[in-house]
Design a protein with these regions (language model features):
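Short strand-edge motifs at loop-to-beta-strand transitions and within beta-strands
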Residues: 1-2, 111-117, 152, 218-224
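Surface-exposed loops/turns
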Residues: 9-10, 63, 109, 127-128, ...
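Extracellular interdomain linker/stem segments of modular secreted and single-pass surface proteins
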Residues: 45-53, 155-163, 258-265
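Short beta-strand segments of immunoglobulin-like
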Residues: 55-61, 167-173
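Beta-strand-rich structural segments
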Residues: 64-78, 135, 174-190, 222, ...
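Short, acidic Ser/Thr/Gly-rich low-complexity loop/linker segments typical of extracellular
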Residues: 100-110, 210-217
Length: 265
């Protein structure tokens, strides 16, 4: 069987099969024969392996938002050869089969591409953390290159939010009494996943309270003893979460508490 040289440039080839003239056989010999030569041609497509080089990708992106990445498809046999494009690529997170980020994007004729990649194309939530972005040449999108991939890392930073704030109705608290308040911390970009063991800060009007950890359901509760010298009227309570290595910070304000002073006739 003929062997195609390893350095053959991918492309379409016409293969000539040649049978030479044979006019010299001794016809007195049994089974001998003479014939004129002929040629036959067959079409051949030479394919080579491909590789995707990612040239530019941001270090991080906010969950639910889009990021832009660029790169190029390379001839994996000889990276110095020009690629004969275009071809199509797809983009997805490694080990996440729930959705493809980009189903198909067409490269230029030299194999380069710039593509906008949504982190949550179906809008059904995305987990936060460091993820591996994979770019893969779509099988069959080019006659000359076999499927190849490239990858790079990106941090998907989750969006957080305080929900279920309490008290939810207007509440009057007397000076000298204690008032309870709190909320639930969730990762809104991941279907309101409850965030446990998060450090939460609270500020009652102008007074900072000791920090507390949210429980397994993401709930944190505070209690504040209102001093007799506290200002009267509607006050604002602010809850703070300073974020983490994979989550954005957030804050919220509770404005349902009014401080009053008891009177004696």
């Amino acid at each position: 069987n003929p062997v195609i040289p390893a350095d053959t440039v991918p492309g379409y080839y016409s293969i000539r099969v040649h049978a030479p003239d044979d006019k010299s056989d001794n016809l007195t010999v049994a089974g001998a024969g003479r014939w004129l030569g002929n040629d036959s041609y067959v079409n051949l497509t030479v394919q080579v392996s491909s590789f995707v080089e990612i040239d530019s990708i941001p270090l991080e992106v906010t969950a639910g938002q889009t990021f832009t990445m660029s790169g190029r498809v390379i001839d994996a046999v000889d990276g110095n050869r020009s690629v004969n494009g275009p071809m199509a690529v797809e983009v997805f997170f490694l080990a996440d089969s729930s959705e493809t980020l980009v189903n198909s994007a067409t490269t230029t004729s030299n194999g380069s591409f710039t593509v906008s990649v949504p982190t949550d194309p179906l809008g059904n939530g995305v987990t936060s953390g460091v993820k591996t972005v994979v770019v893969s040449v779509i099988n069959g999108s080019t006659p000359f290159y076999l499927t190849g991939t490239g990858n790079a890392s990106i941090l998907v930073r989750g969006v957080t939010q305080f929900v279920d704030k309490s008290p939810i109705i207007n509440t009057v608290a007397d000076r000298g009494s204690s008032i309870n308040f709190g909320a639930r911390l969730v990762e809104s970009s991941d279907n309101d996943r409850q965030i446990g063991n998060a450090t939460i800060g609270a500020k009652f009007h102008d007074t900072w309270l000791p920090e507390f950890q949210s429980n397994g359901a993401g709930v944190v509760n505070f209690s504040f003893a209102i001093p007799h010298s506290h200002p009267l009227g509607l006050i604002a309570i602010t809850l703070f979460f300073n974020g983490s290595s994979t989550l954005h910070s957030t804050a919220t304000t509770i404005t349902t508490i009014t401080v009053r002073s008891p009177t004696i006739l």
